[in-house]
Amino acid sequence: MRRLPIFLAFPLLAAAPPAAFVEHTIATDLRGGYQVVVADLNHDGKPDLIALASGMSELVWYENPGWQRHVLAAGQSHMINCVVIGNEIVLASEFSNEAKNSIGLVSVLRPGPDPLQPWTATEIDRLPTSHRLRVADLFGDGHPVVVNAALTGPSATAPDYRDQTPLVYYRPGEWKRRVISTENSGVVHGIFITDSNCILTASFTGIHRFCASKAGAFERTEIAKGDPAPWPKSGSSDITVGHLGKTRFLATIEPWHGNQVAVYTEKNSKWEREVIDDSLLDGHTIQTADFNRDGNDEIVAGFRGQPHSVYLYSFDSAAKRWVRSDLDNGGMGAAACAIADLNGDGRPDVACIGANRLKWYENR
C-alpha cells in the first residue's frame, strides 16, 4: 500500500478551473437524516429529492424547484433506505445493527391519482438488517430488479458480526426474494451498481464483484481486500467508481465507518490501493462526478463525526496527486450524498443529508 499526501493548498494545478458551488439549505428539521434519493416523483421533468431520516416516522420528499415538502409515507419506524423503480418506491425499515433486533421490513410504496398525497405501502419481505437498496438490470435484459444488501447475517453480533451476509433481489410485480449470494461475511455496508450491470460490495472482507452469468447464476470475484487491519477493522465500507480520462478507478471509505478515503487503480490486472486521506471521522458516503468538465472525475466524501464536513478531491494531473478542498466545512455531517443536475443547467450538482439537514450544493 502506498500513501499519498493530502495537499490543502489552493489553487489546483489542473488545466480547467475548479468547480464552484453555491450552498442551499432545503431542510433543517429532519431527525437522523440518512439517505437522499433523486427522482422525478410528480413527472414534471424536474428531479425531486426524497429525504429519508431514520429518526422520523414520515418519509418525505421535496418538490423541485421550490422544494415544497410532501409526505410519501407516514407511520414508519427506523427507516434505512429506499429506491425508486418505475412508478414505485421500495422502502427498507424496522432496522437495527443487531440482527436479533432487526425486523428488516421491506415495503413497496405506490402512488394514488395524486402523487403529492401519501402513497400506499404494501409489505413484500422481512429480511433482518435490510440496509442498502439499489436498482440494477442484473441480467441485461432491460428488466431492472431491486437489489437488497443486508448489513449483517442473521446470527451476527457485535463487535465482530461474524456470519454469512445475504445479498438478494426482487423482480417488480412478483416481489419474491431471490438469493444472489451469501458468500460475503461480516458487515456489508456499501454497494454500487456498475455500468456492466454487476454489483460491487464493500464489506469486512474487502471489495467484491457479483455478475450474473448467461445461465442466471452469480459469479463472485474478489477485487481487493480493503484496509489490511485485523477484523473487524478490516475491509471497506462504501464504494463508487470514477474515471480519470478513460482510466477507471474505485474510490472507497475504509474501514467500516472509517477514517480513510482510498483510491484503487488497475495495473497489470491488479488493483493498487492508495490512501489519499486518513482524517475522516465516521466516514459514510462517497461519490464521483466530473464537476468542472475537464474529463476527470472528482471525489465527494462525507463523514458524520466532527467537524461534520464534506470534502471534494480533485486529481492534479501535473503533480499526479489528489488535492482536497471543502464542499462544506462544518455544516454537514453527511450520512449520504447524491449527484444529479438539479437545476437543468447541464452541470452535476450535489445533494447531501445528515442529522437534521438536507442541502443542495449548486454547481456554478
Question: What residue ranges belong to the model's regions?
Answer:
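Bacterial N-terminal signal peptides
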Residues: P5-A14
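Beta-propeller-forming repeat regions
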Residues: A15-R364
